[in-house]
Amino acid sequence: MKQALAFVVAVALVGGAWFVRTEFIAPTDDPGGTDPAEDVAEQPVTGLAVACDAVLGTACPAGSARLGSQALVDAFSTPDVAHDVLVAPTVVVEMIEESGRSTTTLSDDRRVVATSPIVLVVASGRETDVMDCGPTWTCASSLVTTGDLRPAFADPSTDTEGIAGVAALAGGYFAEAGAPFNLTGFSTGGFIGWLDAVQRESTVSPSGVENIIRFAGSQNDSAVVTEAEALDVTGRAAQNVPVILYPEPVASLAVVAVAVGDADPDDARDVGEQVGAQLRDAGWRGPDGASADGGPAVGEDDGLPSGGVLVALRQRWEQ
């Protein structure tokens, strides 16, 4: 009897979750997302062994190995790297090169094929708190550490979007503290206390924006994600539509395709053009960073620290 009751409850919970998702947020044919596990499609289209950052979702070429940024660092640290082309944001390329573990060379030909700012999505009604003091990442950082803003990130330990989101907030902290955003700054008591507060007040979730909509901000009232994801999810919301903010300085992810080892850079360029077209169709901006929706333009500087600093920030997050 207890087992039967447990089954009924489980079915009810699953059904309720499905109802909330379909009632509040229209479904999409492209889940995108940031699956950190390897996802190899069945039909390669390039004839090349491509490693693709999972933050790019289904824009990754068919047949590519879709990996989170930490898994990419690991994949390029093995004695025999199994990939001809790497498609990822420039910061991930830097993380591989500056990790101290890379076992191969990556081409210097790195043409940007698509960009997306890092944005702060907040539950409707909460945007006033951020707008009143900026909006800046310093303001957002302060609101998080005082418990007045409860953001969600994709997992910073594995995911590009997650570690970039934490880095954007950390940049706000260092700007206010007047301290350098580097390894030296990470060892200060002020930063350690700040990071502890952020981890305490935040939620790790691949569905931060969706959760704002589903639970009307009661679980997390904000999320730090790419603009492309924010526009997609909020555009499908039927109610509890959150607000997209662009704190300054604007941080962004710029996607490149680079040849690995002695692979032909022209082949990497062809892959990049294919991925770039897919990303732009999915709501990413073009290489120039211009916005078609009234958002601020993205400059040449991505507003993020170097790859080596991001590797160290990830290590601090995991401690």
Where in this protein do the model-derived segments appear?
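Sec/Tat-exported extracytoplasmic proteins
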Residues: V87-T90, V122-S124, D155, G172-A177, ...
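Ligand-binding pocket segment of bilobal, Venus flytrap-like solute-binding proteins
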Residues: F174-P247
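Bilobed periplasmic-binding protein/Venus flytrap-like ligand-binding cleft at the lobe interface
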Residues: G134-T145, R150, D155-S157, A168-L169, ...
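Periplasmic-binding protein-like
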Residues: D108-L120, I192, A237-E273
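N-terminal segment of the mature folded domain
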Residues: D29-T158
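Extracellular/periplasmic juxtamembrane helices and adjacent flexible linkers that interface
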Residues: M1-T34, E38-P44, D262-Q319
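Stable alpha-helical elements in mature extracytoplasmic
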Residues: V55-A59, L72, A88-I96, T136, ...
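Short beta-strand->loop
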Residues: A51-D53, V144-G162, V166-F186
